[in-house]
């Protein structure tokens, strides 16, 4: 969970009932215009699938249109102070996303590179410092390291389903198919 998001939640909790709020905690958000997961598609199109860690990683995803659905449902049905995880309701191994991208891109030849976590730590350390020098936020920073090193991103979306009426319409395969189609139509790939 990003540091700034956690701090925002802690602030809201500290002011109690003075302010009405609902917290949505979307897991790996992907889809049209999203850039972090797009970089994976671009890398695979360039024949490299890069991942880190040698232990199994369970991860969850949510397509951007399902996040939009949840926002409107929260506005209509949510109770102030409640917090809801959002995903498509499934748990995937980390390689599943790149496998689906590979299929949608027409199965170009590729090299799968798997590096130890400490390599990611070095990359994110330097990425963070380069970003500070350039006054920009880089995709690979210390926050991203804390996210990517985790091996279990399972979450329970039942409260969102029960209380908001949230029902995701996109599983990962369908969402990746639409994302890659959008990337191609809009000349991102």
Q: For the regions a protein language model found, what residue spans apply to each?
A:
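Flexible, glycine-rich beta-alpha linker
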Residues: 19-39
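A short C-terminal helix-loop "cap" of Rossmann-like NAD(P)-dependent dehydrogenase/epimerase domains
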Residues: 41-52, 107, 133-139, 158
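Conserved C-terminal active-site "lid" loop/helix of NAD(P)H-dependent oxidoreductases
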Residues: 64, 99, 124-166
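Amphipathic terminal alpha-helices
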Residues: 155-163, 167, 171-189
